[in-house]
C-alpha cells in the first residue's frame, strides 16, 4: 500500500561526498599524471547531508545559496566566533544547535557561514543531555485535541530540522571527522602563510529552480518529488475474499517503520519507532504459532505504516484508500475496526528493575476499559517483572502517534498507544541521528511484544489459559531483527532479510523515500524500499496458509484469491502461499 500525499515534498538532489583541497606548501613531488596531481590535492570525505524539503508554506532543510559550488576554508567553531571571511565551520554535536541558533539571530555571522561540518565520535550519546532536532510537540497540527502547546519533547526539542538554511550541512563519518579536524588545525596554523586548507562542496545541492519555494508550485512544475513509500497490512488468519458470513469485528494493531533526522542518510530511529516495529514483527511471529485463531470471534489485522514522521502520510493514505475503494485494502472493512492498538516507542522501559509501559487511551470508555483489562490480564499472565500503567490524566490526549489520524478521520474509534513513557518522551534523541542501537534494550522490546501478543489474543476473544500462557516471544528473533534493522553489521545482509529479499544496500536507513510515478496495483511492491519489501514478505510468510499451488511456478501460477508469491527475490522461484498481505 503506497503512501503518497503532497504534504511534504523533496527533490533529493544532493551529494554525499565532498572534497577537501590541500594546497602545496613548498614540497616538491614528482607527478606522473594529472590524476596523481589531483590525488595529492584532494581528499574525499564521507558525509551525510541535510537536504532541502518543501511543504505548502515554504522550505526547510539545507541547500547551497546559489547554483555555484561552495569553496571555503575550514575553521573550528571555537575559533570562528567572529568570522572575517566566508568559512566552513567544524562543530561538535553539542555545539551544533548553538551555531544554528546564532545563524538565525546574527545575519552578519550567517552571511559568512559557507557550510557546516558536524563531527561524529563513538559513544557521543554518553556525554550529552540529549539532542533532538524536532520540536517540543512533534506534528502538533495533527493532534485531535486543542492543547497543542503541550510539550512531549520538552528538554531536547530544538526544532532546528524545521528551519531553512542556505548553506550545506554535513554529518561526518568518524573516519572523516579525523581528517577534517586535521584540516581545521592546518588552517589555524597557516593563518600567517599563503597556503590554506579549504573545503569544496563539489556539487550544487539545489532542490528547485529559482522562484519555486513551496510544494504546490514545485509539484505543478515537475521540479520535485513527493515523499512516500509502501505501507503494509496483513491479517491473521487470512481474510477470505469469497462470499462469506458477516465479517468479524477487527482488532487492528499498528506501528510505523520510518523515522526522521536532520541528516537524511543517518535516520535509524532505533527507539522511535523501530523498537515498535521489531516488537510488532515478534508479535506476529508468536501469534502465528497459536492454534485456533480461526475460531476466535474477532479478526486480527496488523498495519505497518511508512511516512508517519512527515505528516502521518501513511495513515492518512490508509484512509484515502478506503475512500477510493482501492484494491490495496481489499478484504478490509473500515466500519468493522473496533479497536486500535498502536505499539510506539518500547525500547527504554526500565524503571527500578521493572519494565514499565504506559497505556495512552482515547475513545469510548467501555472499549478502552476492555482493552486496559486485556492489558492487565496479559501482564498478570507473564512471569517477568512487567507493569502496565494507564497514562496520566493530566496529559491532553494521546502522544504523537498514528492513532491521531484514526481519531481525526474516524472520531468514534477507540484506541490505545503503548509507550515506555508517560508525559514526556523517554527518548533523549528523538528524530536524531543519535537514536541508534545503543539507545535501546532488547529485553524491553521482548517484554512489550509479550504484553501486546497476549493482549491481542484476549481482545480477539481468546479465553484458553493454556493457549495464553503458550504465547511466548522469540528473544533470538528480536536480537536478530536488531542487528538487521539497526546496524551495518550484519545489517540488511543478515540471514533473516536475505531469506526474503535481495536488499539494495547493507546499512539500514529509515528515512522515508520518494514516490516515482503512480501507486502500483501489483500484489508485490517490487519498487518499494528494502524495509517495506522485507516487512511485506515477513508478514505474508508468518500469516500464511499453505497453497495448493505451493509447488507451482511462482509468481506465474500464483494468482488465485489471496495467493501471494513470497521470497521471489531470494530464491530461484518463490513460494506460493495464501495470505491477506498487501
How would you name each of these model-derived features?
Residues 1-582:
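Secretory-pathway/membrane protein signature
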Amino acid at each position: 500500500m503506497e503512501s503518497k500525499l503532497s504534504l511534504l515534498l523533496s527533490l533529493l538532489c544532493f551529494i554525499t561526498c565532498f572534497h577537501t583541497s590541500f594546497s602545496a606548501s613548498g614540497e616538491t613531488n614528482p607527478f606522473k599524471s594529472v590524476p596523481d596531481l589531483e590525488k595529492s590535492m584532494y581528499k574525499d570525505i564521507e558525509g551525510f547531508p541535510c537536504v532541502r524539503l518543501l511543504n505548502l508554506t515554504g522550505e526547510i532543510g539545507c541547500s547551497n545559496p546559489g547554483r555555484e559550488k561552495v569553496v571555503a576554508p575550514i575553521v573550528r567553531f571555537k575559533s570562528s566566533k567572529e568570522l572575517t571571511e566566508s568559512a566552513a565551520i567544524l562543530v561538535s554535536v553539542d555545539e551544533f544547535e548553538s551555531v544554528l541558533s546564532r545563524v538565525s539571530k546574527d545575519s552578519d555571522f550567517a552571511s559568512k557561514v559557507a557550510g557546516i561540518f558536524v563531527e561524529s565520535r563513538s559513544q557521543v550519546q554518553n556525554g550529552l543531555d540529549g539532542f533532538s532536532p524536532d520540536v517540543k510537540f512533534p506534528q502538533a497540527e495533527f493532534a485531535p485535541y486543542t492543547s497543542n502547546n503541550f510539550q512531549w519533547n520538552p528538554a531536547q526539542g530544538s526544532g532546528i530540522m524545521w528551519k531553512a538554511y542556505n548553506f550545506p550541512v554535513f554529518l561526518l563519518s568518524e573516519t572523516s571527522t579525523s581528517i577534517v579536524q586535521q584540516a581545521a588545525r592546518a588552517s589555524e596554523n597557516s593563518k600567517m602563510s599563503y597556503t590554506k586548507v579549504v573545503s569544496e562542496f563539489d556539487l550544487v545541492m539545489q532542490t528547485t529552480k529559482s522562484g519555486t519555494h513551496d510544494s504546490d508550485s514545485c509539484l505543478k512544475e515537475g521540479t520535485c518529488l513527493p515523499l512516500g513509500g509502501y505501507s503494509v497490512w496483513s491479517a491473521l488468519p487470512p481474510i477470505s475474499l469469497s462470499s462469506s458470513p458477516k465479517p468479524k469485528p477487527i482488532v487492528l494493531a499498528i506501528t510505523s517503520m520510518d523515522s526522521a533526522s536532520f541528516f537524511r542518510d543517518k535516520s535509524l530511529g532505533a527507539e522511535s519507532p523501530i523498537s515498535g516495529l521489531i516488537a510488532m514483527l515478534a508479535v506476529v511471529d508468536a501469534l502465528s504459532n497459536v492454534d485456533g485463531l480461526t475460531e476466535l470471534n474477532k479478526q486480527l489485522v496488523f498495519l505497518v505504516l511508512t511516512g508517519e514522521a512527515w505528516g502521518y502520510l501513511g495513515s492518512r493514505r490508509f484512509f484515502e484508500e478506503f475512500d477510493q475503494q482501492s484494491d490495496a485494502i481489499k478484504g478490509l472493512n473500515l466500519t468493522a475496526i473496533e479497536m486500535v492498538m498502536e505499539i510506539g516507542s518500547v525500547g527504554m522501559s526500565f524503571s527500578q528493575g521493572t519494565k514499565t509501559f504506559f497505556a495512552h487511551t482515547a475513545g469510548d470508555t467501555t472499549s478502552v476499559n476492555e482493552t486496559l483489562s486485556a492489558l492487565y490480564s496479559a501482564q498478570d499472565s507473564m512471569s517477568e517483572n512487567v507493569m502496565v500503567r494507564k497514562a496520566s490524566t493530566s496529559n491532553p490526549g494521546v502522544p504523537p502517534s498514528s492513532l491521531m489520524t484514526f481519531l481525526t478521520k474516524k472520531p468514534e474509534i477507540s484506541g490505545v498507544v503503548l509507550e515506555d513513557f508517560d508525559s514526556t518522551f523517554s527518548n533523549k534523541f528523538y528524530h536524531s541521528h543519535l537514536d541508534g542501537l545503543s539507545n535501546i534494550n532488547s529485553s524491553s522490546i521482548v517484554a512489550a511484544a509479550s504484553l501486546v501478543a497476549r493482549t491481542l489474543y484476549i481482545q480477539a476473544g481468546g479465553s484458553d489459559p493454556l493457549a495464553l500462557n503458550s504465547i511466548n516471544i522469540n528473544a533470538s528473533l528480536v536480537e536478530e531483527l536488531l542487528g538487521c534493522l539497526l546496524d551495518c553489521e550484519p545489517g540488511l545482509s543478515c540471514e533473516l532479510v536475505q531469506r526474503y529479499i535481495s536488499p539494495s544496500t547493507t546499512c539500514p536507513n529509515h528515512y522515508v523515500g520518494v514516490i516515482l510515478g503512480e501507486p502500483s496495483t501489483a500484489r508485490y511492491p517490487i519498487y518499494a524500499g528494502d524495509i517495506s519489501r522485507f516487512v511485506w514478505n515477513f508478514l505474508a510468510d508468518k500469516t500464511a496458509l499453505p497453497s495448493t499451488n505451493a509447488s507451482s511456478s511462482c509468481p506465474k501460477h500464483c494468482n488465485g484469491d489471496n495467493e501471494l508469491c513470497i521470497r521471489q527475490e531470494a530464491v530461484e522461484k518463490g513460494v506460493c502461499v495464501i495470505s491477506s498481505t498487501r
